[in-house]
From Swiss-Prot:
SUPFAM superfamilies: Photosystem I reaction center subunit X, PsaK (SSF81563)
Residues that span the membrane, as ranges: 15-35, 57-77
Pfam annotation, one family: PSI_PSAK
Protein name, per record: Photosystem I reaction center subunit PsaK
Length: 86
């Protein structure tokens, strides 16, 4: 398979815009909010004093924002494929 065939199979994705950023921020905030109450064993790693959340440390923040980025990327690709954002 040559490179031109592979490139033709890849869908055209949107460039970075303010709507893309807003979708990613919303997805991350939703996952942080859900993770705050859904994570049962928390507070085992270093805490983040700037947030002021008891028992919500660095491992929990990394886990929830990782999930937020996965959901955000899926939402951006999905909304781009049905032409809601471009």
């Amino acid at each position: 398979m040559n490179l031109q065939t592979l490139l033709s199979m890849i869908s055209n994705t949107s460039s970075w815009s303010i709507s893309t950023a807003i979708i990613m921020v919303i997805c991350n905030l939703l996952c942080i909010g859900l993770g705050r109450y859904a994570i049962q064993v928390r507070g085992l790693g270093p805490s983040i004093p700037a947030l002021g959340l008891k028992g919500f440390g660095l491992p929990e923040l990394l886990a929830t924002t990782s999930l937020g980025h996965i959901i955000g990327a899926g939402a951006i690709i999905g909304l781009n494929s049905i032409k809601i954002i471009n």
